[in-house]
Structures are given as structure tokens and as C-alpha cells.
Amino acid sequence: MKLQGVIFDLDGVITDTAHLHFQAWQQIAAEIGISIDAQFNESLKGISRDESLRRILQHGGKEGDFNSQERAQLAYRKNLLYVHSLRELTVNAVLPGIRSLLADLRAQQISVGLASVSLNAPTILAALELREFFTFCADASQLKNSKPDPEIFLAACAGLGVPPQACIGIEDAQAGIDAINASGMRSVGIGAGLTGAQLLLPSTESLTWPRLSAFWQNV
């Protein structure tokens, strides 16, 4: 089967705003008397804003202290902090090798999609000047389930009009790898410590079209 689509996660694959998310969550958590560190922040990668908040409240033993309206307000304020910090994002924030890979995929006439749980994904792609490379971006606001559920990757495949079996998914988080595998796509992991990735690369610098092409032909 010919490779028809490549679907990217955003944070940690195309750019790295994890530190901005962490700073925003850390401030919100501190305001309600919860301390979180960088190690705990690893458990928030690849999941939705609401699920991140739930885990923070659970971590601090305060899961029952906030009703749905109060939780929504906390999540809203976190997003305001995060969006404010995105003003420092420029084209230089694209991770190494990604822009050239996107150009190569376009030259090969392979559809490119985005499967990010971030509601700010369109804003980020625009700031990075990458929007033109993406045929379809899954709308996180329309999803019922967060990763590791495969819903977002299946939505991206549907948006591209290609079957999951003809796609590669690229992720840097365990929840994302699990979601890709559950969708029936081929999985590529970026970074160490990811289990189940069918191809594991140390960084985006190793993520090239020749490498993806060879991987596809050998699976």
C-alpha cells in the first residue's frame, strides 16, 4: 500500500511549547495550593486541557473541591496565560528538520494532517508560518475523547480522506503513540522512553523523508 498521509502531533514534534504550558499550569496550581514540578508535567503531555486540570486536582488531593463551573474557569485562565506567552513564538521555534520534511512531503504529494489536542493549534501554525503545509487540522473542540483514545487521529484521517492503514502518525508522548497504534496507523515516536512506537527516533533532526519512506517500505 502506498503511503498517502502523514499526521503530526504539534507540541514536541513541530515546535516545543511544553515549557509554556508548564509555566501556565504551575501558576494556576500554585494559586489553589497545589505544587507541580517538571516531572509531574510529563504526565500532562498529549492530553486535553480538561484532563490536565483533572490530574492536577487529583495530584493535589482537591479533585472534589471544585465544581464544573469553577474547573472551567481555571482551565480558561490557564489558557489565557498560555496564549499570552505565545507572543514570543516565531518561525525560529520550528523544531530542526520539520520545515524541510513538510516541504518534501508536499513534493511527494503526500497529504499532511495535524492531530493536536491544543485548541490553539491554528494560531501556533500561523505564528510558525507552517499553515500552508497542512491539508487538514483536526478540530480538538469537536472531540469527545482525549489521547490515548484514537479519536483525534481517526478524525485527521477522515479529514484527509485517507484510510488509517495508509498513514504514518508522529508523536512525542506515550498517550499519542498509544492513540496512533489504536487507530491502525503506523507509529513514529520522537524521543526516548516511548514504548510501542514502530519507529523510534532520538529527535526531529532524524525525521527525514528518506527515513520515513524506508520505514514505510519495511513495515
From Swiss-Prot:
Active site: 9 (nucleophile), 11 (proton donor/acceptor)
Sites where the protein binds beta-D-glucose 6-phosphate: 11, 46-47, 49, 118, 120
Residues the record lists as binding Mg(2+): 9, 11, 172
First-level EC class: isomerase
Cellular component GO terms held in the UniProt record: cytoplasm
One Pfam family in the UniProt entry: Hydrolase
Record-listed 4-aspartylphosphate modification sites: 9
EC annotation from Swiss-Prot or TrEMBL: 5.4.2.6
Catalytic activity reported: beta-D-glucose 1-phosphate = beta-D-glucose 6-phosphate
Effect of disrupting the coding gene: Cells lacking this gene are only slightly more susceptible to nalidixic acid, but are more sensitive to UV irradiation than the wild-type. No visible phenotype when grown on glucose.
Cross-referenced CDD domains: HAD_BPGM
GO annotation, biological process: carbohydrate metabolic process; DNA damage response; DNA-mediated transformation; response to antibiotic
Cofactor entry: Mg(2+)
Gene Ontology MF: a single term: magnesium ion binding
UniProt cofactor note: Binds 1 magnesium ion per subunit.
PTM annotation, UniProt: Autophosphorylated.
Keyword entries, A-Z: Carbohydrate metabolism, Cytoplasm, Isomerase, Magnesium, Metal-binding, Phosphoprotein
Record localization: Cytoplasm
Role of this protein: Catalyzes the conversion of beta D-glucose 1-phosphate (G1P) to D-glucose 6-phosphate (G6P), forming beta-D-glucose 1,6-(bis)phosphate (beta-G16P) as an intermediate. Phosphatase activity with the reaction intermediate beta-G16P has been measured. In vitro interconverts beta D-glucose 1-phosphate, beta-D-allose 1-phosphate, beta-D-galactose 1-phosphate and beta-D-mannose 1-phosphate to their corresponding sugar 6-phosphate product.
Family: Belongs to the HAD-like hydrolase superfamily. CbbY/CbbZ/Gph/YieH family.
Comment field (misc): The catalysis proceeds via a phosphoenzyme formed by reaction of an active-site nucleophile with the cofactor glucose 1,6-diphosphate (G1,6-diP). The phosphorylated mutase binds either G1P or G6P and transfers the phosphoryl group to the C(6)OH or C(1)OH, respectively.
Entry protein name: Beta-phosphoglucomutase
Organism: Escherichia coli (strain K12)
